[in-house]
Amino acid sequence: MSSEAKCPFPHAANRSRSNQDWWPNQLRVDVLNQHSNKSNPLGEKFNYAEEFKKLDYKALKADLVKLMTDSQDWWPADFGHYGPQFVRMAWHATGTYRTMDGRGGGGRGQQRFAPLNSWPDNVNIDKSRRLLWPIKQKYGQRISWADLLVLTGNVALESMGFRTFGFAGGRADVWEPDTDVNWGAETTWLGTDKRFSGDRELDENLSATHMGLIYVNPEGPDGSGDYMAAAKDIRATFYRMAMDDEEIVALIAGGHTFGKAHGAAPESHKGAEPEGAPIEAQGLGWVSNFGDGYGKDTVSSGLEVTWTKTPALWSNNFFENLFKYEWEITKSPAGAKQWVAKDAEDIIPDAHIKGKFHKPTMLTTDLTLRFDPEFGKISKRFYEDPQAFAEAFARAWFKLTHRDMGPRSRYLGPEVPKEELIWQDPIPEVDYKLVDAADVTALKAKLLTSGLSVSELVGTAWASASTFRGSDKRGGANGARIRLAPMKDWEVNQPEQLAKVLKTLEGIQADFNQSASGGKQVSLADLIVLAGSVGVEQAAKAAGVNVSVPFAAGRNDARQDQTDVESFAALEPRTDGFRNYVGKKNGVPAEVALIDKAQLLCLSVPELTVLISGLRAININVGGVKHGVLTRTPGVLNNEVLLNLLDMGTQWKPVESDANVFEGRDRKSGEVKWTATRADLVFGSNSILRSVAEVYAESDAKEKFVKDFVAAWVKVMNADRFDLA
């Protein structure tokens, strides 16, 4: 797979320079505005889950099965079956997921947009989506592109004799690219110069080893042909997808049981990718001028490899060939490094010429599965036990294609597996009667006399709910996992204070559940959120505004055995600007981390502004530090923090001992009035954030400030309440 050192950033002479061109380090506040209703052609009231329920699922699958062997002249099917290329399409649609921030994946159909639609690793997948268009057009909005891409991969596997683990719908489309994902800083396709350090240590914020690849270079690190060195790259990227060694082997071998790679001629024959193609190409890219440009003359990755003798049928032949032969390095017609079986007969069928056969071939990264000691043990076991291999691939494929969907409660359709899987972050179903309005009033009274401060009530609820990530729908208040490992021990959650608050809340919960009649119970998850509501109401009352924070019961409490400690460790904030916390492992400026966190919480610029200034007014800062608490009346929910931040009578200067902390001094006397962090001062320095901060700091904004704070607060508290949508 050659990079050809192509720069994806051409500099058009007449292109207007953007603000980002002038100021490359400008804070990307715009990521909070992506996927607004203005870009949605279906309107605000469209409910995909309801539309999906109207889908004739059986008929759709039947149409997909027919498509598999309905070869089209403009893009003929290899081996007379489109299944392998649809498996690749589904794999590449979902395989961009990474655990560190939950971004990537197939949950929104992003493969349709740049940069993914034009990545070198996705070469000619545009043809697969065009083959699907007649079916998408037929079924309309009852099936999203995001769901269709994955379902088609499943049907492809089934049509080739494989039994899948199941399928769940529920992936709603968006209509523009995700701009919040960090794919890397390289300026050439397949570049690696910005993402590695030391002994080839991959940047902790990235998953793929090369710019424009889903995973790793199939020719080995930087095209070296070194199958032993490839093991480190493979583990680095697959581990960041939450896959273990067995899942890695199963996925690679399972995927390479089907189809072929295409390298009939040098890659110089390929035309521009979809985003760079001329307008008359109508979004199709990589048009080749070699021979017919398709079929036997296809040029995709540059590799020319067919792994098995039954490339359109499930078998164990990948492992049979891997272990049967010794391998020697060779080059494809395109010049890519690959491996051919020594002293082998021509047993591999040609994809388009009937009666023609080839020697078995493998990728460099395929040989890694045999010769790496740990991968080798697993591969040998799968070779000797085909049923174990099939089971492992089915489960790993389901995980790959569903990992970013969140809890099972979001799953739709008749093929949802009944088995509960630990990576789905399971929560027990509510099997008791929920509290009513009178119960909520009584519980609020108990909370008011509990001895817990407003800061403790609000801070604990925030700590619980703000773990939510809109990217992969993980975290949130439901489950009350803040009382379980690892969350209970996170430094940002102040373990000692948290233990004290939880003990008090558990006492209130126990008293209520023991005395309530009619089978009523309250979960700790609900009580934590209700406690936060009480704190907010008290803070608003202190500001002279009476408000009732909306509360919806229905959460339940997860168990420790339902909580994968290692998996949840990825949710621990290194920096949390909402609580003015900067951890020891923080690697980005606090204001950048704040915007990133706000985006994961699905907050708009106004919601972010009113939330953080209100939380500063209440002071839920970790350790009770006063940074950013720019008010003489902490605990009162008013706009005084913003008033003081925007006060020109204060001059801000950095503190020499801490690059994140600043002193606000009186311009006349030089006296220190306040301290603040970068996460505070950004609301005065960034022109967009300042414009919104000014609205909330105005004299007529008293009630609006509280009202908008409550709305944003409830949004975060209910972020994982998919049952309320």
Swiss-Prot record:
NCBIfam families: cat_per_HPI (TIGR00198), PRK15061.1 (NF011635). Binds 1 heme b (iron(II)-protoporphyrin IX) group per dimer. Bifunctional enzyme with both catalase and broad-spectrum peroxidase activity. SUPFAM superfamilies: Heme-dependent peroxidases. GO terms for biological process: cellular response to hydrogen peroxide; hydrogen peroxide catabolic process. It holds the Pfam family peroxidase. The lineage of its organism: Bacteria, Pseudomonadati, Pseudomonadota, Betaproteobacteria, Burkholderiales. Homodimer or homotetramer. Coiled coil: none annotated. GO terms for molecular function: catalase activity; heme binding; metal ion binding. Its cofactor is heme b. The record marks R88 as: Transition state stabilizer. There is a cross-link at Y215-M241 (Tryptophyl-tyrosyl-methioninium (Tyr-Met) (with W-91)). Its EC number is 1.11.1.21. GO terms for cellular component: cytosol. The keyword Iron applies. Belongs to the peroxidase family. Peroxidase/catalase subfamily. Residues 1-20 are annotated as: Disordered. PANTHER family: CATALASE-PEROXIDASE (PTHR30555:SF0), HYDROPEROXIDASE I, BIFUNCTIONAL CATALASE-PEROXIDASE (PTHR30555). Heme b binds at H256. The keyword Hydrolase does not apply. Keywords: Heme, Hydrogen peroxide, Iron, Metal-binding, Oxidoreductase, Peroxidase. This is Catalase-peroxidase. There is a cross-link at W91-Y215 (Tryptophyl-tyrosyl-methioninium (Trp-Tyr) (with M-241)). Formation of the three residue Trp-Tyr-Met cross-link is important for the catalase, but not the peroxidase activity of the enzyme. It catalyses: H2O2 + AH2 = A + 2 H2O; 2 H2O2 = O2 + 2 H2O. The active site is at H92.
